[in-house]
From Swiss-Prot:
Gene encoding the protein: ureA
Name assigned to this protein: Urease subunit gamma
EC class of the enzyme, as a word: hydrolase
Entry-linked CDD domains: Urease_gamma
MF annotations from Gene Ontology: nickel cation binding; urease activity
Organism of derivation: Rhodopseudomonas palustris (strain BisB18)
Taxon lineage: Bacteria, Pseudomonadati, Pseudomonadota, Alphaproteobacteria, Hyphomicrobiales
């Protein structure tokens, strides 16, 4: 299987998000990389499903809550930017204050 660096990055984000979701299901609070991975994966998959940039910017801030994160993590993550592939091309999606 020959994957481009971009495809490897997407696969790594997806795997990290899967692990984070399993931990969350066990009641473990998310750390910084886990929270970013879940939100990033949500955006990438939403783009693949055909959702709009504006919709993902709004919905991306509703993926996880403060209660699901370790103390101080929401304050550490001010913006998340993800390059996602939409049906009409690649676009940058920015979610401001993603954990509310």
């Amino acid at each position: 299987m020959n994957l481009s660096p971009r495809e490897k990055d997407k696969l790594l984000i997806s795997l990290a998000a899967m692990v984070a979701r399993l931990r969350l299901a066990r009641g473990v609070k998310l750390n910084h990389p886990e929270a970013v991975a879940i939100i990033s994966d949500f955006i990438v998959e939403g783009a693949r499903d055909g959702r709009s940039v504006a919709e993902l910017m709004q919905a991306g801030a509703e993926v996880i809550t403060r209660a699901q994160c370790m103390d101080g993590i929401p304050e550490m993550i001010h913006d998340i930017q993800v390059e996602a592939t939409f049906p009409d091309g690649t676009k940058l999606v920015t979610v401001h204050e993603p954990i509310r």
